[in-house]
């Protein structure tokens, strides 16, 4: 039976500096990304996003706006991995320097593009930073490899 895995990712932006909060992940999905994680059983998508930001950054966020998603579909198993995207400029609390997930800090959007990013995070940024798209869809499976340019063999469809 096909599985569905639900996760979230949150762009927290400082309204005064326009810098965004990033995480330099060191365990899984290594590289620069926005904070986020799994939706737990019995938890709303929104509440899971608030909880994950708190756990990974120490910040309390509110008034999150849903801004899109990425839908990964495994063509061999029919499993689905869905990441719900949120963003906010409203937060409080003391920022942690790091957690077991990695270092967290504010930086400019321009600087992010020059940092070593988590896999496919550059594609996700297109949805977070533009009102042009609300979804990325991708068919993939474990047999697909990177091509000679180091790019994945699968296609990202923006909607």
Identify the meaning behind each predicted range.
Residues 17-18, 28-29, 72, 88-94, ...:
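Short, charged/polar surface micro-motifs in flexible loops or helix N-caps
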Residues 39-62, 72-124, 151-159:
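Unchanged
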Residues 1-20, 35-38:
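Conserved N-terminal beta-strand and adjoining loop/helix that marks the start
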Residues 129-159:
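Charged phosphate-binding loop/patch that engages nucleotide di/tri-phosphates or the phosphate backbone
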Residues 29-32, 105, 144:
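A short local loop/turn or secondary-structure capping micro-motif enriched for an aromatic residue
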Residues 22-33, 41:
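N-terminal first-folded block
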Residues 3-5, 15, 27, 78-80, ...:
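A generic fold-level signal
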């Amino acid at each position: 039976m096909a599985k569905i895995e639900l996760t979230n990712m949150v762009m927290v932006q400082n309204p005064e500096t326009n810098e965004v909060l990033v995480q330099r992940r060191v365990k899984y999905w290594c590289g620069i990304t926005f904070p986020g994680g799994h939706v737990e059983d019995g938890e709303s998508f929104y509440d899971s996003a608030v909880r994950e930001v708190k756990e990974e950054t120490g910040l309390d966020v509110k008034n999150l706006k849903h801004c899109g998603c990425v839908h990964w579909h495994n063509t061999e198993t029919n499993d689905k991995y869905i990441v719900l995207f949120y963003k906010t400029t409203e937060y409080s609390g003391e920022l942690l320097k790091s957690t077991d997930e990695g270092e967290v800090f504010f930086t400019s959007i321009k600087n992010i593009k020059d940092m070593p990013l988590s896999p496919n995070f550059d594609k996700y940024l297109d949805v977070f930073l533009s009102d042009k798209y609300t979804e990325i869809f991708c068919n993939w499976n474990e047999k697909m490899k990177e091509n000679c340019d180091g790019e994945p063999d699968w296609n990202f469809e923006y909607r």
